[in-house]
Amino acid sequence: KNMNLNRKKLKIVYYMKPVLGEDELKSNGYIDLKYDKNNNIICAQNLYNSEFKNNVIYVSNSEKMLSYTGDKNFFLGNGNISNPDGLKKSSLNNENSLGKKPCIAYEIEVEIDSLSEKEIVFLLGAEDAVIDSKNIAYKYSKIQNCKQELENVKSYWRDILGRLQVYTPLESMNIIL
């Protein structure tokens, strides 16, 4: 939300550490990152761990990604997670994470007109195939689809949780049950 009379331009950076295995250290160097510019999605797979080899995790958002990195050392640099060097660079290096300590970091730029607001969606998911990841990322890159799905989930849980209600003399027990 921009409550000022001037247009605002924001740089937003998304960061995560993908493990895709039983241990972060054992995953180091084996996470393969693929950025698909046409679908605005980054997919990652663990090529080493046979149990997770066919699992795909993905990140996407409702805005255009400007740059990304899969290299945790590049992103953090001499800084730390609270103050990474990657935030001080004009752009990230667009490199894969193979052979490196992995991360998924990407940046977007958002302009918000004066006295207005803008909604942005960030997606994180897991699928069995890259094509499924792309289809879901495309669907939920639209804000309205996200809002509709949120309402569907709320309705589902209202339905489930509203089926059975227990009333006891103790209000605290009613809450627990």
Q: Model-predicted segments: where are they?
A:
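Short Pro-Gly-centered flexible turn/kink motifs
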Residues: K8, V110-D128
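Glycine-centered flexibility motif
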Residues: L76-G79, G99-K101, G125, L170
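Short, well-ordered beta-strand segments enriched in hydrophobic/aromatic residues
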Residues: K1-N2, L115
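Polysaccharide-binding surfaces and accessory modules of carbohydrate-active proteins
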Residues: N2-S90, Y106, I131-Y167
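Beta-strand-rich interaction surfaces with strong enrichment in secreted/lumenal proteins
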Residues: N93-S97, E107-I112
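Substrate-binding groove/exosite segments of carbohydrate-active enzymes
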Residues: G99-C103, S116, S155-L177
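Residues at structural and domain junctions
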Residues: L92-N94, K101, E119, K139, ...
